Regions:
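Hydrophobic beta-strand positions that form the internal "hydrophobic ladder"
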Residues: 78, 118-119, 171, 219, ...
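Asp-box/BNR beta-propeller loop motif
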Residues: 84-105, 133-151, 178-199, 228-241, ...
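Residue-level detector of Asp-centered blade-edge/turn motifs that repeat once per structural unit
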Residues: 70-75, 113-116, 163-168, 213-215, ...
């Protein structure tokens, strides 16, 4: 195997291991208790939209990092979709706790936060939930404290989701449950399947999707052999860049893309022209590979976070020049 093939093999292997453990959502969750070095008591109050009080449970361990995104209103607040719930990570204070009660701690696969700070996700019902599997498209308007099921309930399991930054009425999702790609033009209320010609026979090689804030019908897809482009809302894809691919991608303000690259560029890369050109940004720690998720803070684009196949999370406050390990092998550092 050449270097690119070896990297792709490692990434495929990591994805396979994670997906094998994320199919039913019926396993017992790990214990959640207060971390010994964090000022976070079991009696801490977490207000929700109805001003009810919930008990914050500090994170002792996470398993299977699937996706992550930063809060749109408050700087330095990272949310991480995992096998056993949505983790709230405050990079300012070092506090890590689970969002919501046990019945709302699902196996969050695809996860995003829209420009309006609406949380959306998909996946499998968690321990204690009576919901059907898969969950379809879920929404939360209280930072993931509570979730409501909606479109495609019990029909799809979106492992990849994207909300257009220019028009969040436009959303895209890849359903790993049925091997299909969908599009919504009304904020996720209604969805239609798109044909995805050009990549639909290789969905097992699809890593990432992102749409252009200046043209919501333009979509980039990171595939094993390069980046593909659709100009018609996901109906047809053509090879756009065969020199590199993006195994995970996040969009910052003004359409800036940050991605984990494999190929001509290895590691963190940035594009200011929506994928036309890419440049190296900083340097990822060697032990961070393979990277499964990446997020940029819209409140401060110097702040980045990555999640790895080893259930580790790193964050940077200087756009990738230096990194701090905050979760190591599933345990808050």
């Amino acid at each position: 195997l050449d270097n690119k093939e070896a990297k792709m093999f490692a990434f495929f292997s990591a994805i396979l291991i994670i997906l094998t453990g994320c199919t039913t959502g019926e396993e017992e969750p790990p214990a959640v208790v207060d971390g010994p070095e964090r000022d976070l008591s079991e009696e801490a109050e977490q207000p929700n939209e109805d001003n009810e009080q919930q008990v914050r449970e500090a994170v002792e361990e996470i398993e299977h990092i699937h996706d992550m995104a930063f809060d749109r209103e408050e700087e330095g607040i990272l949310y991480v979709g995992t096998h056993y719930g949505l983790m709230h990570a405050d990079l300012n204070s070092g506090e890590f706790y689970w969002q919501g009660t046990e019945e709302d701690r699902h196996d969050f696969m695809g996860f995003l936060i829209t420009a309006e700070n609406i949380f959306m996700s998909s996946g499998h019902p968690g321990h204690g939930s009576e919901l059907e599997n898969p969950l379809g498209v879920m929404k939360s308007e209280d930072h993931g404290g509570t979730w409501e099921t909606g479109a495609l309930y019990s029909e799809v399991d979106f492992h990849l989701m994207d909300a257009n930054e220019g028009d969040s009425e436009y959303l895209y999702g890849f359903d790993a449950y049925g091997g299909r790609m969908f599009k919504s033009q009304d904020g996720g209320e209604d969805w239609s399947e798109v044909s995805a010609e050009g990549i639909n026979d290789r969905f097992h090689e699809l890593y990432s999707i992102i749409s252009d804030p200046e043209d919501s019908e333009r979509v980039l897809a990171g595939m094993a052999n390069g980046i593909y482009e659709s100009l018609d809302g996901g109906e047809n894809f053509n090879l756009f860049n065969n020199e590199l691919t993006m195994t995970s991608v996040s969009q910052g303000p003004d359409g800036i893309l940050f991605a984990n690259g494999i190929g001509r560029i290895e590691g963190l890369m940035k594009s200011t022209d929506f994928g036309e050109t890419w440049e190296v940004v900083g340097e990822l720690p060697e032990e961070a590979a393979p990277v499964l998720a990446i997020a940029v803070d819209h409140n401060n684009t110097d702040t980045l976070a990555i999640g790895t196949a080893s259930d580790s999370i790193y964050w940077s406050d200087d756009q990738g020049k230096t990194w701090q390990l905050i979760v190591e092998n599933g345990e808050p550092a």
